[in-house]
Amino acid sequence: MQLLFHLTGIVVLLLIALLCNIYVTRRIIKPRFGKRGATIYMLVHGVAIATLSVIGCIASLGGLEDSIPTLVWVMYGFMLLYVPKLCYTLVSLLDYLKRPRGHMAGYVGMAVAALSFALIVGSTINRYRIDTKEVVVKSSRLPKSFEGYRIVHFSDIHLETLYSRAYAQRVVNCINTLNPDIIVYSGDMVNRKSTELDKYFDILSQLKARDGIYSVLGNHDYGDFVKWASDEARQANLTRLHQLQAEMGWTLLNNASTHIHRDNDSIAIIGVENWGEPPFQQYGDLNEAYPHLYDETYKLLISHNPRHWRAEVLPNSNIDLMMAGHTHALQTEICGYSPVKAIYPEWGGLYNEGEQFLYVNIGIGCTMTPTRLGATPEVTVITLKSN
């Protein structure tokens, strides 16, 4: 079914590309460069379409086991070549609503096409930037010894489609220079398999914080997007991911909790496995992670999916701060708005109900396309203060 879906997508993209090329050839190329120019244009773009299609089909027919990065770049190639043409086509067709046919929509279409091309290229560059955000969370429940406590929060690296050890090193260097008391990672280390971590193990092992590094699993970490030969193979992959994080010096909180002590005070660090709505599996169990959800201890929760906050955390606990990821802001954020808000009302940034807070980090990595239109990769410094 997955293979059929990808092949159908390739066919649809081919049809769109063909129609756009025919239209652009007849509207722009042939009138300006003649029949010979039009023929050369169609041949060059025909080769481009064929090359992308063959690569995409080979990757899809390979069962997608090790082909996701290839398919991502095939999709990006189509975007770069044909989104501008599609924009031009849709806008310039408005000229045909007038008799005799006008030209203004064609000029506007060219401007829109140029803008779309610039946005795609710019979003590719932006995916390798780092936006360090600082927020303050105030609470009357915070113990005095933890006044000014610094949490550095990051999320959603998706190592399979990160493509750059140099960028991973920059992220680690950025975090280490922020003087963290604790580092929190809210899931989706890998895209599909634990082997993705091998290439970056030495870099991520360099992270340092006074009170340690704590993480949870995201929906991608379980290997549920891979067709495994057996349940044993899937479990072995997951176990290996657990082991690698432990070897890096990270503490993976799988429906578990611990306490951090300063002087005579302490706070709780709680982590749940992925809590997700269908089609994602429901692994998270808040009560198992911390049975005394209404005790007087100041509590930090790490949970991958921000919907967990309203669904279970607010109604069933007095947890002070939950940190999540997952949304990526749909890798699109313009003037503080992301279309992912239609799915996740709390999609990025700080939210609160009284003195209960949620922070959603929009992540480091990418899925589907290697682009971030706005939605710059994020590292967050959360400073705890008494209210």
Give, region by region, the residue ranges found by the protein language model:
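Contiguous N-terminal and early-domain "leader" segments and peripheral loops that mark the onset or edge
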Residues: 105, 117-129, 134, 239-247, ...
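N-terminal active-site segment of His-dependent metallophosphoesterases
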Residues: 7-25, 30, 41, 67, ...
